[in-house]
Amino acid sequence: MTRQMSLRGRKGKPGRITFVGSGPGDPGLLTARARTVLANAALVFTDPDVPEAVLALVGCELPPPSGPLPAATEQPAKASGASGTADTSGVADKPPAEPDPSPVIPGGPDVRPALGDPAEVAKTLATEARTGVDVVRLVAGDPLSIDAVITEVNALARTQLTFEIVPGLPDTTAVPTYAGLPLGSAHTVADVRGDVDWAALAAAPGPLILHATASHLPEAARTLIEYGLADNTPTVVTANGTTCQQRSVETTLAGLMDKAVLAGAGPDGLPAATAGALVVTIGRTVANRAKLNWWESRALYGWTVLVPRTK
């Protein structure tokens, strides 16, 4: 989304900072409050992995632009005769137009990436809010399920600024549900893209749900096996969860160390270039997928249907 400077919503007092969870991917799973905040947002700082379908909702209910129209451009006088001299007869000299002092308010939201470490992001949010602008911090997933965002919130809590937190549906529960994997009341979630207590994770009650990218999976699997998990523990890797591009691959914990398993050359595999975040479900619940795989088993799922039309 193109960055546009916007003067919408500027007030004499500090603005509100609203953390909004984007949910697992499907914009239909956003909360009603999240949709309202995003639709009226003029300034948004977003995570890079927020889906485009969610970003498309930003600012969709902002009022139309206001302010003066651009000044009309004076047309040059027409040439008269073959001499090429301008015909100025009957045209009085006009003084230059005075500029209109009223401010022009450009249309469209201002969407920027949330850059830097959590302290830097929090400082940026606070700086903008102190100018009187309402600021939205759009977070992939659920705000208070992400350590870095918790740090941002804690930093803002030490200021006098007003903030709000709009939860998002965590992908660590939504994606297994869309993959037909019931988690029950006891399960363990870990993001293996950062520091992990592997001994505690391997001993934790299952099923295990991991946040990872494809590059993290071999080492994560190898380490979990070293700490006592069986190498044949059933595992499902899901990409693009809750969207129409969702793909899940069933394998074992040892299978995560095999690049061919994740390459997904066949129609049931992962996209060949799976660069984004994956949700990995590990444990006996994988056995339920055969009968509870309601999303990816739908008729024509994953097909592109062309509808011919006459001219």
Question: Predicted segments — roles?
Answer:
Residues 51-53, 170-174, 217-218, 242-245:
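Short gly/pro/ser/thr-enriched loop/turn and capping motifs at secondary-structure boundaries
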Residues 7-70, 93, 98-114, 304-308:
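Glycine-rich, flexible N-terminal cofactor/catalytic loop recognition
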